[in-house]
């Protein structure tokens, strides 16, 4: 059966810092867990585009999206999505993505990198310290390989 409509959940941040356009890790865990327990399947961008064009998708479908490409998407969102077999579409600001090795995430245990709130992230980027707030290409590759995130470009600054 085809879904009559598909909910779209849009996030920027999953961080203990919280904020207006953020979910805390506990809230994000609860939301994704509830979707998974209810039998929802997360869609890819191509599946959602096909649905918008009249194509069929499972009755319990959801599109989970993230904007910009913040470090906390790797640190806190990636492990939750992996744990529940869900995926999200991340629209990156490619000019803010950096190089370097993969940093720790919450699914590994041990110390985690700081994941500041939205305003602090904007300040870090403006100060030329984007690596403290944004993803690295190595983390993008790891999330893509794990199947937790699909990446599209939002903009290049």
Task: Name each model feature, range by range.
Residues 155-157:
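Conserved small/polar residues in nucleotide/adenosyl-binding loops
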Residues 8-11, 92, 152-153:
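Short beta-strand segments
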Residues 5-6, 16-29, 34-36, 41-148:
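Active-site beta->alpha N-cap acidic-glycine motif
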């Amino acid at each position: 059966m085809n879904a009559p409509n598909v909910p779209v959940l849009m996030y920027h941040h999953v961080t203990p810092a919280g904020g207006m356009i953020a979910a805390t890790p506990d809230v994000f865990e609860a939301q994704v867990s509830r979707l998974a327990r209810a039998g929802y399947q997360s869609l890819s961008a191509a599946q959602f585009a096909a649905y918008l064009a009249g194509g069929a998708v499972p009755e319990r479908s959801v599109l989970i999206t993230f904007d910009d490409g913040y470090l906390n998407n790797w640190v806190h969102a990636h492990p939750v999505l992996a744990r529940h077999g869900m995926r999200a579409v991340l629209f990156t600001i490619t000019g803010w993505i950096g190089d370097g090795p993969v940093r720790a995430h919450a699914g590994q245990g041990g110390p985690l990198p700081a994941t500041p709130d939205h305003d602090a992230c904007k300040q870090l980027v403006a100060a030329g310290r984007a690596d403290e707030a944004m993803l690295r290409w190595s983390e993008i590759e790891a999330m893509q390989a794990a199947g937790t995130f699909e990446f599209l470009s939002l903009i290049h600054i």
